[in-house]
Amino acid sequence: MYIQKIIRDNIKTALNEIFQFNTDNIELQQTKKEFEGDVTLVVFPLVKELKSSPKEISEKIGDYLVANSSVVSYNIVSGFLNLLIADEHYLSFFNSVKEDSEYGFFDTISNEAVMIEYSSPNTNKPLHLGHIRNNLLGYSMSEIYKAAGKKVYKTQIINDRGIHICKSMIAWIDYGNGETPASTNLKGDKFVGDYYIKFDQVYKKEVEELIKSGVTEEEAKQNAPILLRAKEMLIQWESGDKDVVELWKKMNGWVYEGFEETYKNLGVDFDSYYYESDTYLLGKEFIFSGLKSGVFYKKDDGSVWCNLTEDGLDEKIVLRADGTAVYMTQDIGTAVQRVKDCPDINTMVYTVGNEQDYHFKVLFLILKKLGFSWSENLFHLSYGMVDLPSGKMKSREGTVVDADDLMQEMTSTAKEISKSLGKLEGLSEDEKNNVYSTVGLGALKYYILKVDPKKRILFDPKESVDFQGNTASFIQYSYARIQSILNLSLIHI
């Protein structure tokens, strides 16, 4: 505490001037409720060194502090010196905090930086409620590290390749009729997400028709015509087919524009971006070097594995028999690439849902076995799912709660409640809209961040905007009431 630091320094000065004694062993604690005071000095550790009674030491230090510091009075209880701090000190402290725009921030304490990964969405649909929790956790961690004096790199890896984006592309080719986000007045990510939903609808219908024709359910799911076309498109993309790559770039571009709008509204940002299309081939060189050093081994079919059974984990494939990479290969390469890009990185934090807990245990252990010293400072910021009262979100069925829709709902809910309370008289429409946004998004952020990340959340929009209880709305309302009282008083703070 700030006050304890000041009192500690005052006590050290008192000991030096009264007893000619220097020490850093000064034990302070908050005064117990049953006694009068704000801060308590535990005197017993000083008795042996000063060769005086606890009462005599307490009186001399207490008298000195009353004469030379912000202490206005003291009392002694069985070797505990209880100190009462002057009200003027707190007023002075509050004023200094008000004038210090960076109160609570530390200067940069080292040249070692932290990289924090968060968001990392797929490019086939808009961000949803789960992404909101991810972004708020990752961004908050970044700001906390900054305040603690660390240099921070905020990054994400965008999952911009694979069968999921090909599904949206196939559906757009079949049913898009040349439409664009601009022509339909839709955000780009929402526009592309609608075609992902369309693909799933067509896919399910084709599966049903195949089953009716006598094909087994498993065969139908694997051989639905639209799915086979999406798989073929992925092969074309990987071979660099010009038309496929151009469409891929165009549709991903629409999605990125939509993402940026969502990030802006949520109040988060990034310093750098990594794309899976650039990183999915990274890591192979480390698999080959790991083979030579004995970290990995090759099975008869040619696939490469890491045996982690002695570490309490399972065997993990790191390269397929056909030589293609798996996600673990990519993550190994991406981690190394990030350190190359930012050599001052000492710590990396991955903000990813708890369904990936095992993946990160394996990743961190493999990087350690490969001999990367920075692997000791890798951390998985794991978090639980977010549900709404209506149930778990499912993007393929079009029942996902989009982040944009939820933020708009929060603003609308705040508007409804604020109007019912009748506290906005005299404000312009712009000022009212600013209040609605501040209250609504503040409620969303606080409701999510107040919960232990490891716990699953049942998010209730109306409950989060309640002006009673442990909510952002209550805190904001309390702040506004305090400001109103101060404005009506003669005290200037």
Language model segments and positions:
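Accessible peptide chain termini
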Residues: 1, 491-493
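Generic start-of-chain signal for non-secretory N-termini
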Residues: 1-21
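NTP-dependent nucleotidyl-transfer catalytic core
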Residues: 16, 21-41, 45, 53-491
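Phosphate-backbone binding interfaces of nucleic-acid-interacting proteins
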Residues: 50
